[in-house]
Amino acid sequence: METPGSQSSLHRANLERVVRAVRLAGSLTQAEIARTTGLSAATVSNIVRELREIGTVEVTPTSAGGRRARSVSLSGNAGIVIGVDFGHTHLRVALGNLAHQVLAEESEPLDVDASAAQGLDRAEEVVARLISATGVDEAKIAGVGLGVPGPIDVESGTLGSTSILPGWAGTRPALELSGRLGVPVHVDNDANLGALGELVWGAGRGVRDLAYIKVASGVGAGLVIDGRIYRGPGGTAGEIGHITLDEAGPVCRCGNRGCLETFTAARYVLPLLHSSHGADLTLERMVRLAREGDPGCRRVVGDVGRHIGSGVANLCNLLNP
């Protein structure tokens, strides 16, 4: 066991700082690593050499500011990560490496009445297929990220009440999936994970406050305040789908009337077009028809956009992201 404050523990901490900096940035020159981590150029050079020798990073020549430099990035062989996303009617699994490359992915429909155990069994099967198809070394799997459409208690990992996945409330999906796969699993609300992705690699890079809006079977927001995901004590922060737009509006699945979700979610808006476009109309077809100029679909999509805009405006006035 390493003694805190010892040379070996300090060295490991410096290794982790360098790997984290490169992982978040995608690639950095050694000078940029030194500035980002606060380590000396000599320390960075030694660590990069060590990481290169064990196959964790790759070093390639580049040109920075007109001078020759070496760009450091994580090796595709450094480790494997898996993403699992559960929705109201779908399961999606992606397998990738630490170099930000997606190696394989698969989506399949999911019965809305399926229990958590049934859904996780399906996820285990899909993960096994992707591992077999890609031939990756299971020993290199670093972990799994699991997204679910409901509030997660951070302390216990328990999924709160959710009508999007009604058979999942009260379960601990990360613990259960970890037991099936034998690797660490991190679980969070899907909108929170979307916000984190934008913060680290997307439109939110370089900002400290943002709101990520997800519209699917429900409507939710992932909130980042001062660079950190804000969940609230019960993990329900960002449930903008239940902002009241019309007290006399349609009854929502939450029991209230006129929630934003009742004017935007597919289960509520598609029936508006059933008489003119058939009961088998899908969300994808409605959007396609709207793009092609169909008057009814254009009207419904326009109304959805206006209602979402009202909800987002309220959120922006409150938080100023």
For the regions a language model picked out, list residue spans one by one:
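Short glycine-aspartate micro-motif
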Residues: 81-85, 141-145, 210-214, 220-222, ...
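ATP-binding/phosphotransfer module of carbohydrate and carboxylate kinases, centering on a glycine-rich
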Residues: 1-140, 201, 247-251, 256-321
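Short, acidic, Ser/Thr-enriched surface-loop or helix-capping motifs
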Residues: 97, 154, 224
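General beta-strand structural signal in soluble alpha/beta enzymes
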Residues: 59-60, 184-189, 223
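Short, small/polar residue-rich loop motifs at catalytic or cofactor-binding pockets
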Residues: 89-90, 216-218, 238
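Short, intrinsically disordered, charge-biased short linear motifs at domain edges
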Residues: 236-245
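Glycine-rich phosphate-binding loop and adjoining helix at the ATP-binding site
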Residues: 102, 106-209
